[in-house]
Amino acid sequence: MAVTAQPRLDVEAVRADFPYLEELVDGRPLADRATAGFESAREKVRAFLNAASEREIVFTRGTTESLNLVAYAWGLDNLGPGDVVVTTDLDHHSNYVPWQYVAGRTGATFATIPVDDQGELVLEELDRIAGLGHVKVVAFGLVSNALGTVNPAARLIAWAKEQGAISVVDAAQAAPHRAIDVQALGCDFLALSAHKLCGPTSVGALYGRAALLERMSPFNLGGHMIRQVRPDRTTWGELPAKFEAGTAP
């Protein structure tokens, strides 16, 4: 369903957009128009999620890249032995494998919240998991891609805060079906994909609290994400450009 649920492409509409796509972020009149449209889309995503600022919306190539961005850019710098990374047995591999891998790289413990026979998370296991060490990450999907289970987001995010952990939410399945307010949820990061919302493929977005994004290292390096390049050092652009290297998706 990750690719079969997307709408059919209107070839003529795509062809009509080519002149603008080719001119994106280039300093010429067409580029200015394309950039304005690009940033207008960012504001629409901000409003859709009720994020506090456009600076908190990073465009990516999909939910998978968004979640990997957090796992690598935050996880590699903040996890270590004695820390615990928590996800669930309901989660898509995109919100499971990156955390498993980064936990292994950093020496952190990787733990999952099990699922009962009704397809619900066994929240009674949270106390046991908390006893494994210092919980630093709680990653989960709002809605399971396999069973359609609606996970108790408020409870999981509250537990993450109690543990002093960040919360990372996969909203790919939920975004087409329910309103999402990141400020009301209180999550630290949230990822979604355009094609789940009848948009184009290979386009996604990551919401991240500005205070966290500012402290994170870049995930990809290259054009459009730098402020200045010198032989001795390179400085990064402001949010969200710091995480948007290369040609826009």
Q: For the regions a protein language model found, what residue spans apply to each?
A:
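Pyridoxal 5′-phosphate
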Residues: 1-249
